[in-house]
């Protein structure tokens, strides 16, 4: 009996363990299903915080509360998620009849409008950010010359008769030191420098020509760009705590206080653009404290360059400037934001001397520029987000897009935005939305250097579809963690050693050192890439990537290089062209021998752990030797790009054709998960309900500028579209024509009593009296379907493919444009039998109308929208003479000379087609 009892007890325990295991497995399966279902639900109905924002320019500022409310309501209705308020220059003189009154920046009336805009936006569920200044960079009337951006000025005075006369000083200038050197002002020998009295006088005669060098603490005298009325003044000294403290007190505090108990989501610092600033009053003392020696005796070397010692001094000067902008500009702004229950959003690049590690200070890094295959401010910002665990990277998007203003199309928007997504962006800040009151006329106001995305734009009716696409992709690219494989070590210490007076930008130097060919080689090999710098490696203690590429580099801090050597035990280090051999600064030259020894151990000795390659042509093989491609592609792949996010139970691949020709490829994902789904990021549909991956790859055909989502997952899911239907695509399905609709249309212009018959498709600018028309034109016709439609077949309206063209602009042309003349110029909304079937704003110009078409007679209506350029081309150029007389020349309209109407309308051919799944 005792044995039986023990036996039954053991059986009970075994059953309990089994039940627990089953319950655990069911729970895990539920979690996996829940995770996948949550991902799909978020994709179909993304949350509001992923919607694109708009930079909202207040010109003047000449704003009124009724117009502010109207524009905010319009934005909300268009799917725009928030605004960044940026007051800028006036565009009209005060005109009571037109309701134009330019307020003074920071006046009580202006601040009351800021408060009203914030309250109204919040009531609409919109986010509100604000620039802590007007125009850019920070500065204004409160910035005295003493607090203005500084620069090191050098006056070269020939020594005549053993005597030198000091130069006259401008207001605010101060002599730092004076030296006499052998040679002329352009070719002197810094090694011969002898210090002389600041006041000049007799000098010791030397053999040959002599020159006196007077080093002067001066100012750039740069003024704020594009300021509002009352915001004019000097750009502040970004290296000086006193300067930013004054700005925070006099400018930022009143602005933020206007928000009351609803603080701005973030406060914003635009791209620095403090040109030529390389000095501040406290620099000599700060330099000696941080670098351990006196800079002043080395000023002739700093100026002359050309020696190892001079480069080391220049490095130390640059590093000190970087320290000062981090400590005296970025940190105070971050602390100010936190103290006011906000966040600091910053474009931390450009002039002056910020480094990648400085991106760790702002809570919200922001980039700019769609340079996907070359060094990019945007990849700079997203790399920092990935390194410092910031899940959201924003980007100023569409700056200079297809200039001039009003020329940009929805296709242009998508072409640039998709590159931003590939660069790691997942929050779009559109550039931008001009405040434009009725008194401004049509098509309203615009910024000199930007596209226009407000309701004065004729194609604005399709904006909700555009913003939904941006919202959907932005949200999806916030899920999980970034999965970029490759880190490029930025040679920032070499960049600082290359600084010269007036030129102290790390990011400008990176353009010379991170070649587009290197970026292209990495991307074409099937990987994605981030940047990293030595300071970040030192801070993190390791490199959170499988592969580190060291491009040609001379200098590196020893502590960081030791960590790289340690990382090489598990990660892969590839040096390209030249491995480091030097300590960075003058007081670190003693580390050079050990740095060179590490390079030898990594790349030369018999048991070396790293790889050394001599040319960019070897990059692909070196990477493939290190790890398999994340996305392996064959076929016609020019312009194909991707970005990968990794989740616990799935991998997300956002795949884009960035070019104007069709991609037709076979792709293989490195992920070893067995199942895959294909999602349409535009319509929110699951295109392929699920398939097993067998290693043979997936067929991929993308029209120009088309994008797609692949979700590689652990388990197959039921395929459900946004409308609740399963949608499956097969590669061998073919189109069968139901009807050719390339003729027989009627067109109706607003104001016409009756539509007119259109025999052939083409530009409406060729029609009588329509050359300068901008707006909506309605195309309509009937189509008879003479047979019953096949169950499960997909019926589509195909509007054609358009015509590609080459970019014939100069290489340095500003802004981006899509290199395709589409068959729909520039956007359209399609109705079938009175129901909205969808919109057309990018390739493929094709709409699934399966649920709207039926056997028998069907009515098709296409509402087509062009750009406002045609309207502008028919108007006289705007005369800003009186405006400039009052306010000065604060802007110049870009590319507005000799405007010509742009082809508009439907071009076809148009077909109604049926695709039967086989």
Regions found by a protein language model. Give the residues of each.
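Bacterial N-terminal signal peptides that target proteins for export
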Residues: 4-22
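An acidic-aromatic loop/edge-strand motif
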Residues: 136-146, 150-153, 158-165, 169-192, ...
């Amino acid at each position: 009996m005792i044995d039986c009892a023990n036996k039954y007890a053991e059986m009970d325990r075994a059953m309990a363990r089994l039940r627990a295991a089953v319950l655990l497995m069911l729970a895990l399966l539920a979690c996996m299903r829940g995770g996948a279902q949550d991902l799909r639900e978020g994709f179909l109905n993304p949350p509001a915080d992923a919607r694109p924002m708009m930079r909202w320019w207040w010109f003047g500022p000449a704003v009124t509360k009724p117009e502010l409310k109207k524009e905010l309501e319009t934005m909300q209705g268009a799917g725009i998620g928030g605004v960044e308020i940026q007051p800028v220059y006036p565009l009209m003189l005060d005109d009571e009849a037109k309701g134009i009154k330019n307020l003074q920046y920071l006046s009580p009336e202006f601040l009351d409008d800021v408060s009203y805009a914030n309250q109204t936006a919040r009531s609409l569920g919109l986010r509100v950010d604000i620039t802590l200044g007007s125009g850019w960079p920070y500065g204004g009337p409160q910035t005295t010359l003493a607090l203005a951006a500084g620069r090191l000025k050098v006056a070269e005075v020939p020594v005549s008769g053993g005597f030198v006369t000091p130069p006259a000083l401008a207001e605010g200038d101060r002599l730092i030191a004076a030296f006499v050197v052998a040679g002329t002002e352009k070719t002197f020998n810094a090694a011969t420098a002898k210090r002389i009295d600041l006041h000049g006088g007799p000098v010791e005669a030397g053999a040959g020509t002599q020159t006196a060098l007077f080093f002067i603490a001066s100012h750039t005298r740069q003024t704020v760009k594009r300021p509002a009325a009352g915001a004019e003044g000097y750009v502040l000294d970004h290296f000086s705590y006193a300067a930013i403290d004054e700005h925070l007190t006099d400018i930022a505090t009143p602005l933020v206080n206007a928000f009351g108990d609803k603080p701005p989501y973030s406060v914003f610092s635009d791209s620095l653009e403090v040109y030529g600033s390389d000095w501040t009053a406290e620099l000599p003392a700060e330099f000696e404290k941080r670098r351990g020696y006196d800079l002043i005796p080395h000023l002739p070397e700093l100026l002359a360059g050309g020696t190892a010692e001079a480069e080391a001094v220049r490095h130390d000067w640059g590093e000190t400037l970087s320290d000062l902008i981090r400590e005296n500009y970025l940190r105070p702004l971050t602390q100010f934001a936190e103290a006011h229950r906000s966040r600091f959003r910053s474009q931390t690049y450009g002039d002056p001397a910020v480094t990648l590690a400085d991106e760790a200070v702002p809570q919200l890094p922001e980039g700019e520029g769609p340079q996907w295959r070359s060094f990019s401010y945007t990849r700079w910002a997203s790399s920092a987000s990935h390194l410092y665990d910031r899940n959201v990277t924003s980007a100023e998007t569409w700056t200079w897009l297809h200039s001039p203003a009003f020329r940009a199309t929805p296709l242009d928007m998508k072409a640039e935005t998709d590159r931003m997504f590939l660069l790691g962006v997942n929050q779009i800040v559109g550039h931008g939305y001009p405040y434009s009151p009725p008194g401004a006329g049509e098509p309203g106001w615009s910024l000199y250097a930007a596209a226009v995305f407000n309701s004065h734009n004729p194609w604005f009716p399709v904006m909700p579809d555009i913003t939904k696409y941006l919202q959907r992709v932005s949200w999806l690219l916030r899920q999980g963690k970034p999965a970029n494989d490759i880190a490029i070590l930025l040679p920032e210490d070499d960049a600082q050693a290359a600084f010269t007076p007036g030129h102290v930008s790390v990011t400008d130097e990176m353009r010379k050192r991170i070649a587009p060919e290197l970026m292209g080689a990495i991307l074409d090999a099937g990987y994605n890439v981030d940047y990293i710098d030595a300071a970040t490696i030192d801070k993190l203690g390791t490199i959170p990537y499988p592969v580190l590429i060291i491009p040609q580099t001379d200098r590196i801090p020893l502590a960081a290089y030791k960590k790289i050597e340690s990382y090489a035990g598990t990660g892969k280090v590839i040096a390209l062209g030249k491995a480091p051999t030097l300590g960075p600064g003058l007081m670190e030259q003693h580390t050079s021998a050990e740095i060179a020894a590490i390079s030898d151990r990594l790349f030369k000795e018999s048991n070396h752990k790293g790889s050394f390659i001599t040319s960019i042509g070897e990059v692909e093989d070196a990477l493939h030797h290190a790890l398999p491609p994340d996305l392996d592609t064959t076929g016609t792949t020019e312009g194909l790009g991707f970005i990968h996010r990794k989740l616990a139970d799935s991998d997300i691949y956002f795949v884009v054709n960035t070019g104007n020709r069709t991609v037709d490829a076979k792709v293989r994902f490195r992920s070893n998960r067995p199942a895959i789904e294909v999602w349409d990021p535009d319509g929110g549909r699951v295109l392929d309900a699920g398939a097993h991956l067998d290693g043979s790859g997936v067929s991929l055909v993308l029209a120009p500028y088309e994008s797609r989502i692949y979700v590689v997952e652990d388990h197959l899911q039921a395929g459900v579209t946004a409308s609740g239907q399963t949608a499956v695509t097969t590669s061998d399905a073919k189109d069968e024509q139901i009807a050719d609709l390339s003729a027989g249309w009627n067109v109706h212009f607003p104001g016409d009593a009756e539509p007119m018959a259109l025999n052939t498709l083409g530009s409406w600018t060729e029609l009588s009296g329509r050359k300068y028309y901008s707006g909506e034109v309605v195309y309509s016709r009937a189509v008879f379907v003479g047979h019953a439609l096949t169950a499960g077949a997909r019926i589509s309206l195909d509007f054609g493919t358009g015509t590609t063209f080459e970019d014939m602009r100069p290489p340095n042309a500003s802004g981006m444009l899509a290199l395709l003349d589409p068959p729909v110029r520039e956007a359209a909304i399609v109705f079938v039998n009175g129901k909205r079937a969808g919109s057309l704003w990018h390739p493929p110009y094709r709409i699934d109308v399966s649920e709207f078409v039926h056997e028998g007679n069907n009515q098709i209506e296409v509402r087509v929208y062009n750009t406002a350029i045609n309207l502008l081309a028919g108007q006289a150029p705007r005369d800003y003479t009186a405006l400039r007389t009052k306010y000065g020349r604060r802007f110049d309209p870009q590319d507005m000379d000799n405007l010509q109407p742009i082809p508009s309308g439907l071009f076809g051919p148009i077909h109604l087609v049926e695709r039967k799944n086989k």
